């Protein structure tokens, strides 16, 4: 659809122009800082930052109904810059010119309704939001599109020259960072730090394929994170972990899309989000809050964070009901199938604490919850979900297991509708599925496959076939016909087929 075909009252708003001012605000001391510095923590108190906007064109002039109309019409516009997360440009980064936006096809991932079998199992309607269908096969692309668009903008404005983008990763962040940095070409190089032996082969192959320098170190993600934080503090590098506030902005698009897909009616919705470094749940809360304050939605959905008992610092923090008695303590992680969430000291924890308070205050009631699930529950849930037509990764299984726990705890009611964040594609974690089917988990995982969920190929062997067939010389004539009939007959028995 072309601009001149749009209603006159929104035509000038469809393709936005850069406007307003953006600034960092410290979560701790609330000081503000200019965005044309690569800041990740407050220079004064050391706390993490969040990004804010002011004086954005049309922002205060337009009501919620008009914003909804603008975003719905932008769906029909064939313009690269606002096809992805920047459909919601004014709510993400309204200072970046459209020609500086990096778009690789991220965002607007499908909401897939659970089938009748799954609905019956849990007792309510729910959906999987398949963020594994992003370009690098995970939700990280939302934040990376924003962070690299910002770098692209600042590099051109400030003439910064060559830049090294760096991150620590459990696998998905490194794949996304390397992909988006590669798109920007020679002026941005990427390096990623991974915990040796704790990233799936599929995830490891991605940054290597994108040309990143991949550095593996002994330990876990939290150790890698400390190293990249040290590098960011002492060297000229761009940190691309969720400590980078631009990542949070891009990931807010997850909330905006859910609101739009439900026609902005989210009153009885419950969003299930796995928690690792806590950037994603930060973004989900922040996104819904922005839409609520701007009048695009009239209610705030419930937010349920989910953690494995093998990496559960946020769950432990909120186990204490008295806010005055809560004390955050990092935990030592144990092996987890939800590798992307295997983090014991999430850098966005201060953001979570701040936004949970804001969210519940705006909702007028407690609307944020955290549940804990076992490794067994995660794997069983992933296998069951995918046996019913989904592509859930282990973190998607974590969300599904969390839905059941939240229902048991009374956080989610029968008339609620669940939305489960499946953060990555199942193919990234196919090794865990194979371990489940073969019952080959290390005891530390504490996963014992259910017999009814295991599945392995049935190999058919025929001596006659091996005797008469060789490469390039398959059996022919009656020999071949006999073999086909013999094999077909055995398969029919295995599959319990009935004769015509």
What is each PLM-predicted segment?
Residues 12-103:
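N-terminal juxtadomain amphipathic helix
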Residues 81-157:
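Positively charged, low-complexity intrinsically disordered leader regions
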Residues 108, 203-205, 215, 219-239, ...:
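Active-site/ligand-binding loops adjacent to catalytic centers
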Residues 141-147, 166-184, 200-202, 277-284, ...:
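Short glycine/serine/threonine-rich phosphate/pyrophosphate-binding segments
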Residues 149-157, 175-187, 289, 401-411:
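Alpha-helix C-terminal capping segments
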Residues 157-180, 187-195, 267-280, 303, ...:
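A short, small-residue-rich loop immediately preceding and capping a beta-strand
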Residues 230-295, 379-383:
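Active-site/ligand-binding-proximal alpha/beta "capping" segment
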Residues 375-432:
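Claisen-condensing/thiolase-fold acyl-transfer catalytic domains that form or cleave C-C bonds
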